[in-house]
A protein has these predicted regions:
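Conserved acid/base catalytic micro-environments in cytosolic active-site loops
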Residues: 1-192
Length: 192
């Protein structure tokens, strides 16, 4: 597969306890960041715009809610809602966003991660499963890992709820747990 834009992609999935952790990540990132960041944080769709606005006020990066057809750009942190997927349009990765009345989560982390797994050969990807209840994102993390992406789960020490990260670590052969401050450093290094 030929090289895609953006060349580096960071995926973050979170649930209970995630907003505060995502705020810490967003606030720590420097300008001139060389990766696109896509965040799937479980919350009602009506709260996504205000969450994106709050992050944008605290980050040196541009933060916005992902919209249908938006091309992913380096140095931008996107907050997804609904049934968001990443698809290819020429040499660019773009968002495809649909409503799914049967979805258990908003947004669905597995849907996002599974869609990105198709592009591991054309784009360098690192994915993170942060604090949260249940197992959303685990299946997608495993698909990313099997394709060659690096996947990291938040540690029990810093996760508010060690459900999703624990399931990812249990099921993924190479998924390791890291404290939140270590995750922030990994993200900063990846986007340098």
């Amino acid at each position: 597969m030929k090289s895609l834009e953006p060349k580096k992609l960071i995926l973050i999935g979170a649930s209970t306890g995630g907003p505060a952790h995502i705020e810490k990540i967003a606030a720590a990132l420097p300008e001139n960041f060389e990766a696109a960041i896509v965040v799937a944080q479980h919350m009602g769709a009506e709260f996504i715009p205000s969450f994106a606005k709050r992050l944008n006020e605290r980050s040196k990066l541009s933060v916005m809610q992902a919209r249908e057809g938006d091309a992913l750009q380096k140095g931008v942190l996107y907050i997804v809602s609904e049934h968001a997927q990443i698809i290819q349009n020429g040499e660019y990765l773009v968002f495809s966003i649909h409503t799914n009345p049967n979805a258990h989560f908003n947004p669905d982390i597995n849907t996002l991660f599974l869609s990105a797994a198709h592009f591991v050969k054309g784009c360098e990807i690192v994915a993170f499963i942060l604090t949260g209840i249940g197992d959303d994102g685990v299946e997608g993390c495993i698909a990313l890992e099997e394709g060659g992406a690096r996947c990291i789960a938040e540690s029990e020490k810093t996760a508010v709820v060690y459900g999703m990260p624990a399931r990812a670590k249990e099921r993924g052969a190479n998924i390791h747990a890291k404290d939140l401050y270590e995750i922030i450093e990994i993200i900063k290094q990846f986007g340098a």
